[in-house]
Amino acid sequence: MSEEREPIDAIVVGFDEQDRVLAQPTSSVTADPTSLVGKEVVYLDYNGNPWKGVVREAMEDVLVIEFEAMRAGQEIPGLGQGSLVRISV
């Protein structure tokens, strides 16, 4: 029987040259951070609209997140350094 785990919160610390989000988990990840690659990420903008992304890479304590909207050239309202994103585990 699999148990439902709480999502992991992460704080946006920057962006890379491909406009992907760089985020650090707010608590230590017990498993190998690479186990989060492929997991769904949700950001709620200031209007409560959910924006979905995916963890693409894990580099030490930084996760690289790609949002479909940003890849399509769309800006996500309010997403910036210090924003909170949630990773489903």
Feature locations, PLM:
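Short coil-to-beta-strand transition motifs
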Residues: S2-P7, D45-K52
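Short, solvent-exposed secondary-structure boundary/capping segments
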Residues: D19-Q24, D61-A69
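Ser/Thr- (and often Asn-) enriched beta-sheet segments in non-cytosolic proteins
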Residues: V42, K52-V54, R86-S88
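Short amphipathic, basic-aromatic surface patches that mediate peripheral association
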Residues: S27-T30
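C-terminal structural segments of small proteins and small subunits
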Residues: L63-V89
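Short coil-to-beta transition motif at edge beta-strands of beta-rich domains
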Residues: P33-L44, G78-V85
